[in-house]
């Protein structure tokens, strides 16, 4: 109860502070550049200057927060990446040289690119197919709700659920893991799925695909509904079958939205951390960049320089895709 009251008071205080800020800054601006009581060129000049400054007064808190929580951490991370374990001794590019020669880093890069090849493609594909199918059945909204539900679960929560599905017990013991129970029922031998090198990456990917398919489905369903009916009717009149209508008429018209969904999931994949941490903690050759960074910075490594260098690599991989995604989304919204 105390936490709820504290949260409410914090929200009220925040609103009051914002209101006081906007009121006082506008008051000061009108005092410095008054237009009331002024005439002619002076009034026009003051009004023009005040109107040009006023938007920046509204943007100032957001710009301050952006600088404090985004720009400063980026600069600090780059600076730390050029220093040693304690962040004190300048070592230049030694941390980046270490990364190139480190086997675990190379394994993490390989795993991340493996995730990039599989997760965005399958999440977008399943989302598109499900969106197209559920729009044609009367219980489609119920199906969409069920498929979207994993989006409401945290990555750690989803990992715990799937950890039970992949659970392994020795042969002869009762299998509580759903997957091994099915394998044993079919006459097979139980497997420790998440400890199988290379293949365990795919078992972890299933979790993120399970979550992100709902996201892709919702966005692509809205895009499909925005396709003009006239184009589909014209294709039917011309004798096109269902496959031709879908792949040659519908998909090309929503290609921009598909690209936005794909790249959004790609950005998420490059930063994947929670699932790997909760399922394997990077063991059995399942390490990824974000978890490796966490290990070096906050665990046994305790090396802020190397951890920051890995963070910079993640940023370099994410930023170009993020910029392209924003531009493409802006172009799509402008087109509609």
Swiss-Prot record:
SUPFAM superfamilies according to UniProt: MalF N-terminal region-like, MetI-like
Pfam families the record matches: BPD_transp_1
Membrane topology, record value: Multi-pass membrane protein
Record localization: Cell inner membrane
One cellular component (GO) term of this entry: plasma membrane
Keywords: Cell inner membrane, Cell membrane, Membrane, Sugar transport, Transmembrane, Transmembrane helix, Transport
Domain ABC transmembrane type-1, chain residue ranges per copy: 109-325
Family annotation (CDD domains): TM_PBP2
Transmembrane segments: 4-24, 55-75, 113-133, 146-166, 176-196, 202-222, 258-278, 304-324
InterPro entries in the cross-refs: ABC_transporter_permease (IPR051393), MetI-like (IPR000515), MetI-like_sf (IPR035906)
Main location per the UniProt record: membrane
A single GO BP: transmembrane transport
Family under the similarity heading: Belongs to the binding-protein-dependent transport system permease family. MalFG subfamily.
Function: Part of the binding-protein-dependent transport system for alpha-glucosides such as sucrose, maltose and trehalose. Probably responsible for the translocation of the substrate across the membrane.
Name of the protein described by the UniProt record: Alpha-glucoside transport system permease protein AglF
Species assigned in the record: Rhizobium meliloti (strain 1021)
